[in-house]
Amino acid sequence: MAELTTIARPYAKAAFVFAKEHDALEQWEKMLGLAAAVAGDASMRAYLDQPELDDATKVSAFAEVCGDELDESGRNFVAQLTQNKRLPLLPIILQLFHELLAEQQQFTDVEMISAFELDDAATDKLVAALKKRLGTEVNVTTSVDQSLIGGVLVRAGDTVIDGSVRGRLNRLAEQLNS
């Protein structure tokens, strides 16, 4: 996954810079969201993976599915991704675009996964600690994963803070095995 993120990052940055220069960040966010959904669709992937199709046909089909939501610059972006065999990276490109957008707006998108539902006081305390550590405001998305056993797993961009019991047990097992 880290390798795919590294490959996708220049595309996300190029899209972000272009959108910012043309005052179209919101429009590009919507376009990339739709394009990522289309690229992530199993039937569309199967169609685009056909080796007998040339790049122009793939781009045309992709643009037709996206409809009017994909403007000329978006179509050119999709064409470049298709030519470089990077179209499957669109969901990662969208994620990185969101991170760049949040960074520009002085926000960091944070995913907090806990073993059990957190009450408001615990969430507020964690948000305050994250604001201090990251140095920005945070947009928090919370979810529950009981397989963590206890504790919290936090993802903020490329940073992962694993304070879960499962993570501690895994680290302990690694130490015992080495």
Swiss-Prot record:
<dbReference type="GO" id="GO:0046933">
    <property type="term" value="F:proton-transporting ATP synthase activity, rotational mechanism"/>
</dbReference>
<comment type="function">
    <text>F(1)F(0) ATP synthase produces ATP from ADP in the presence of a proton or sodium gradient. F-type ATPases consist of two structural domains, F(1) containing the extramembraneous catalytic core and F(0) containing the membrane proton channel, linked together by a central stalk and a peripheral stalk. During catalysis, ATP synthesis in the catalytic domain of F(1) is coupled via a rotary mechanism of the central stalk subunits to proton translocation.</text>
</comment>
<dbReference type="InterPro" id="IPR026015">
    <property type="entry name" value="ATP_synth_OSCP/delta_N_sf"/>
</dbReference>
<dbReference type="Pfam" id="PF00213">
    <property type="entry name" value="OSCP"/>
</dbReference>
<dbReference type="InterPro" id="IPR020781">
    <property type="entry name" value="ATPase_OSCP/d_CS"/>
</dbReference>
<keyword id="KW-0139">CF(1)</keyword>
<dbReference type="GO" id="GO:0005886">
    <property type="term" value="C:plasma membrane"/>
</dbReference>
<keyword id="KW-0472">Membrane</keyword>
<dbReference type="InterPro" id="IPR000711">
    <property type="entry name" value="ATPase_OSCP/dsu"/>
</dbReference>
<protein>
    <recommendedName>
        <fullName>ATP synthase subunit delta</fullName>
    </recommendedName>
</protein>
<keyword id="KW-0066">ATP synthesis</keyword>
<keyword id="KW-0997">Cell inner membrane</keyword>
<keyword id="KW-0406">Ion transport</keyword>
<comment type="function">
    <text>This protein is part of the stalk that links CF(0) to CF(1). It either transmits conformational changes from CF(0) to CF(1) or is implicated in proton conduction.</text>
</comment>
<dbReference type="GO" id="GO:0045259">
    <property type="term" value="C:proton-transporting ATP synthase complex"/>
</dbReference>
<comment type="subunit">
    <text>F-type ATPases have 2 components, F(1) - the catalytic core - and F(0) - the membrane proton channel. F(1) has five subunits: alpha(3), beta(3), gamma(1), delta(1), epsilon(1). F(0) has three main subunits: a(1), b(2) and c(10-14). The alpha and beta chains form an alternating ring which encloses part of the gamma chain. F(1) is attached to F(0) by a central stalk formed by the gamma and epsilon chains, while a peripheral stalk is formed by the delta and b chains.</text>
</comment>
<comment type="similarity">
    <text>Belongs to the ATPase delta chain family.</text>
</comment>
<keyword id="KW-0375">Hydrogen ion transport</keyword>
<keyword id="KW-0813">Transport</keyword>
<keyword id="KW-1003">Cell membrane</keyword>
